């Protein structure tokens, strides 16, 4: 799912071990357009996306995927961010942020 959102927070996390070595990891808070009460989400970015931090306030097109899994009878949801493309100017999306 692609969304247009503003980066509210970017937290670089410690690198994680993968089958191919180490990879970067970041936790990103995104706020959708729609003003102060707009919906937001917290997702995890890995690899190249996590290795190129973007400034808070940057408006981006984000490729976000949601996964659910069950563990010990409880259902959990993971939000992964696969791509972040900064928009060149805020005028491209209007004044919704």
Language-model region placement:
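Single-stranded nucleic acid-binding surfaces, predominantly the OB-fold ssDNA-binding core
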Residues: 1-97
């Amino acid at each position: 799912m692609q969304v247009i959102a503003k980066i509210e927070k970017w937290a670089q996390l410690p690198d994680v071990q993968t089958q191919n070595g180490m990879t970067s990891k970041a936790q990103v808070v995104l706020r959708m357009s729609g003003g102060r009460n707009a919906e937001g989400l917290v997702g995890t970015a890995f690899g190249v996306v996590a290795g190129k931090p973007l400034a808070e306030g940057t408006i981006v097109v984000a490729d976000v995927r949601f996964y659910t899994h069950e563990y010990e009878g409880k259902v959990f949801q993971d939000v992964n961010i696969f791509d972040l493309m900064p928009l060149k100017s805020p005028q491209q999306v209007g004044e919704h942020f």
